[in-house]
Amino acid sequence: MGCPSKGATGGGIVTTRVRLLVGTTKGLFSFESDAQRRDWTTSGPHLGGWEVYSALGDGHQGDRILTGTSHMAFGPSVRVSENGGGNWSQIPEGPSYSAESGFTLNRVWQIVPGHPSEPDTLFAGVEEAGLFVSRDRGATWAELDALTKHPTRAGWFPGAGGMCLHTILIHPDNPQRMWVGISAVGVFRTDDGGETWRTCNEGLARVPVGTPHPEVGYCVHKMVLNPDDPNTLYMQYHQGVFQSNDGAESWFPIENGLPGDRISAELGAPFGFPIAVSRSGDLFLFPLESSEQRTMRDGRLIVYGMRRGSDRWEPVGDVVPDEPRHVSVLRDALTIDSLEPYGVYFGTTSGEVFYSVDGGVAWDRMPGQFGRILCVKTWIQEDQDAA
């Protein structure tokens, strides 16, 4: 399956494959299409019975997929397939805290590639919150323990989903600068590759977690980087939606047009979990009913977007206008591919996967219904054949 086009070099034919990796509470599912993204094939469940909180299609090594998995009986692990999901094995030396640390590794929430200048590097964010690095494409892992040794560590407390490091962002021009998001602790930034870390939560309202450290106690749900300006970040927070224009030194609300926004003075700040940004700078998220209910407002599965250059959110798609959907979309279950026009994809807590290839105006549903969807990741593969 593929959409052929002339290659830029050698006169070959480049075939684009679009894969969607969907992690659920009962395994991983894979969807595949061509660049048109109209017809999809499905495979799975892979890793049946395992929770899959994170998934990464490793473009540096063929059909390699890495997953962060957990099981109520067997615990957490990183599992890898070298053939696109056909066979799986556990990485023996996966992320693991030392006995002396006093921490317990419960889940692997995030696996991301390192900076493009470091093709063998991977990072993993885990619960209890910590950051691990692999310099050999995932074969072995080491903790970047300056983060867990931060002076505020005694004041870290979990959110409702656990004390998880769920977001890892790398500056595109400077591999030494990274940001991480921890629930319900806050944002940290390093400017020296993880040797030291500083809190970056100015402008956010603390949540009542009882910590004596004023620098932490901030429940960041998800963050993304502006594709054109890496000093600009966007955040879905427990108590609103925020932007930073100074590398996370400070944050300010961007809620105009959202239900519950401060400008319209409706009760409560906009609550939600995921936020995603396209390569063109369009933003997408899902406002939920409230922190208490955590389901779609009035049972309507509506996607909100802020187009590049705008300062206002708009409802860009009523996904299932004729049916109620009292569901949620979790923090890592919304993603956007890198094609043009871009595709937007998300999965719900009731196990449905929806997608749009026109900027969120029209939506289709993938065939099938699955377990509670934990993560949705795109993987673009380009195969070049000889002319």
Where do the protein language model's features map onto the residues?
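Extracellular glycan-interacting surfaces
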Residues: 1-387
